[in-house]
Amino acid sequence: DGREKEKEYGTYEIPGLKNTRTLLTAKGATPAMCTSMTPQGLAITEDYVMISAYCSTQKHNSVIYVIGKESHNFIKEVILPGQPHVGGLAYDPDHKILWYSSNINGIAQAVSIKMDTIEAYDYDESHLPVDTFQTVSLYGIVRDSFMTFYKGCLYVGCFEKYNESVIARYGVDAEGNLIDTMDEELGMNFEMAVPLDYSTISEQAQGIAFYNDKLLISHSFGILPSRLVVYEQSDKRLYVNENSARTYRFPERLEQIVVEGDNLYVMFES
């Protein structure tokens, strides 16, 4: 049926673009079919390819599509609470936890779900959003547009159209929780995760990934050709165009990227 050829070329079909089972946000647990899902984030686990998507009409709950890594077949949709943009997904393999980007009242947040919870989730049985594990507000970053997990830390980046931006690095404890604190000197009046450090990046960044001693950043905006830019990791943490080691040109709308082993996974919005 052509699947073997598709598998050979390493492609995964993004499900749910024509219609996705989800919930009508304004009516709680009311099942609904969304025809306007926009794919955003990408994560790779031991067994799955996971893609996040949000409703562009702002009527339905956001979702995560779970795809078999070896079979390339769609397994199920996981309904998220509310309508986060879910621009970023990140997988913590040590604690078997999936992170996704969200926000509340204009404050960037990172939300985690245990993989056991994702595997046990059944839309037909519950017609409810999945149970989350931890929700943490992020200090020091305007939006969490994309993210990745690397060497025990969650890296979160912010998309800017025309200006340089940042990647913030946040620590995780032994249980897989983001470490948060209440620091009044930083102007907080509730607990937030505080970055261990920042890196400067060029504009229009959509995704980040690490490979050996290199940092990879995807850049795209609208219908313009996309770029994948490779940098040598540096203590200066200044990853802007003029410091790049190599640049690759990609078709438009390149979104999140993930490195697993020696393989690079890239996702396109449309």
Language-model segments: which ranges?
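Sequence/structural signature of beta-propeller modules
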Residues: 1-30, 270
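Beta-strand-rich domains and repeat architectures in extracellular enzymes and scaffolds
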Residues: 21-60
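Surface loop/turn motifs at the tips and blade-to-blade linkers of beta-strand repeat domains
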Residues: 30-35, 78-82, 135-140, 196-201, ...
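Structural signature of eukaryotic scaffold interfaces centered on beta-propeller domains
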Residues: 31-45, 87-96, 139-155, 201-211, ...
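Blade-loop segments of beta-propeller domains
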Residues: 38, 63-97
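Structural motif
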Residues: 58-65, 106-117, 162-175, 223-233, ...
